[in-house]
C-alpha cells in the first residue's frame, strides 16, 4: 500500500515536471517568435523611414506606445502592399501620427 502511494506520488511529480518543461519551452518559443517579429519590424522601419522619422517614432513609442504600434503596423501593411514608393521623412510621419491620433482619440465631455 505504501509502495503504491509512493509510486503514484512519483508519477504525479514526473507529470508535473513534464508539464512545467513543456510550458517553459512554449514560452521560450513564443518569446523567440516575438523577438523575430520585432527584428523584422525594425528592419522594415529602417527601410521606409528616414533616421529623423525613426527617432520621432521612438520618442512617440515612449509616450504613446499604442499609437506608435498602430503607425508601425499601418506602415508595414502599406510597405508590403507596395504603396510606399519613397522613404517617409519626419514631416510625413508627423502628418500620419496626427491623423491616426485624431481618429483614435476619444473626446470626453462632461455636461453639468
UniProtKB/Swiss-Prot annotation:
Matching InterPro entries: DNA_bind_arc, PDCD5-like, PDCD5-like_sf
MF (Gene Ontology): DNA binding
The entry's keywords: DNA-binding
GO (cellular component) term, any one: cytosol
Lineage top rank: taxon: Archaea
Cited PANTHER family: PROGRAMMED CELL DEATH PROTEIN 5
Stored HAMAP family: dsDNA_bind (MF_00026)
Alphabetical list of NCBIfam families matching this protein: PRK04239.1
Family: Belongs to the PDCD5 family.
Record protein name field: DNA-binding protein TK1278
UniProt source species: Thermococcus kodakarensis (strain ATCC BAA-918 / JCM 12380 / KOD1) (Pyrococcus kodakaraensis (strain KOD1))
Amino acid at each position: 500500500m505504501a509502495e503504491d502511494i509512493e509510486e503514484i506520488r512519483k508519477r504525479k511529480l514526473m507529470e508535473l515536471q513534464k508539464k512545467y518543461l513543456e510550458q517553459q519551452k512554449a514560452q521560450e518559443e513564443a518569446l523567440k517568435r516575438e523577438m523575430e517579429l520585432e527584428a523584422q519590424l525594425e528592419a522594415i522601419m529602417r527601410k521606409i523611414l528616414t533616421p529623423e522619422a525613426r527617432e520621432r517614432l521612438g520618442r512617440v513609442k515612449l509616450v504613446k506606445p499604442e499609437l506608435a504600434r498602430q503607425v508601425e503596423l499601418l506602415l508595414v501593411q502599406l510597405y508590403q502592399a507596395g504603396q510606399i514608393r519613397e522613404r517617409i521623412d519626419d514631416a510625413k510621419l508627423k502628418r500620419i501620427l496626427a491623423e491616426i491620433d485624431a481618429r483614435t482619440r476619444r473626446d470626453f465631455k462632461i455636461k453639468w
